Amino acid sequence: MDIPIRFKIYLFWKNLFSKKGDSPHIKITKEGRGVRSVLFFLPEKKEDAKVINYFVKVENPLSDYEIGLICSEKAKKFYPHVENVSLFTYNDNDLTYFSTIKSASLLNEIKVKNYDAIVDLNTNFCAASSMLFFDLDAPLKIGFDSLINRKIYTITLERKENAFLESYFSKILSLLGVKL
């Protein structure tokens, strides 16, 4: 994953002044009950959106789960059926120079929901999602592997170029304890 140098500098600066404690340890077992609420950060690429629409089932969300979705205004057109879930969007005015979300109202809106898990479905590095995950206190944070994401996410998935996205997404569902 290619990570811009200005974002690396920003994250270094943020780590210096952030008094964030270590994430709580989690244990994944067959006897676990899974999560009840999940926030998915939706990708901006049209190709990924086709698979994501099926995976997240935005037209008919997973019953018994509180599902939240977040995406940019530009990407919202790729996800037309989002009436049944909490949808959070941001635009270019909500981003800082470092492409991170600066809108305090949006961050507070998401924090109030207190999601059990947050999942970054971007297969490429996304500064907005990485820093949003840094600021949220969900016990389970899942995303694709990168040098920076290893420090932010609880679980990272290594993306192989020849593997199908669907296999990664089914792995994410099993980690969440979601039964289809």
Language-model features, listed with the residues they occupy:
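Short N-terminal or domain-adjacent regulatory/targeting segments
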Residues: 2-37, 46-47
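Structural motif
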Residues: 37, 41-45, 72-73, 117-119, 121-123
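An aromatic- and histidine-rich active-site surface loop
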Residues: 122-136
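Active-site-proximal region of nucleotide-activated glycan assembly enzymes
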Residues: 1-6, 150-180
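Histidine-anchored nucleotide/phosphate-binding helix
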Residues: 38-41, 45-65
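Glycine-rich, highly charged phosphate/nucleotide-binding loops
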Residues: 18-24, 89-109
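Short internal beta-strands
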Residues: 65-74
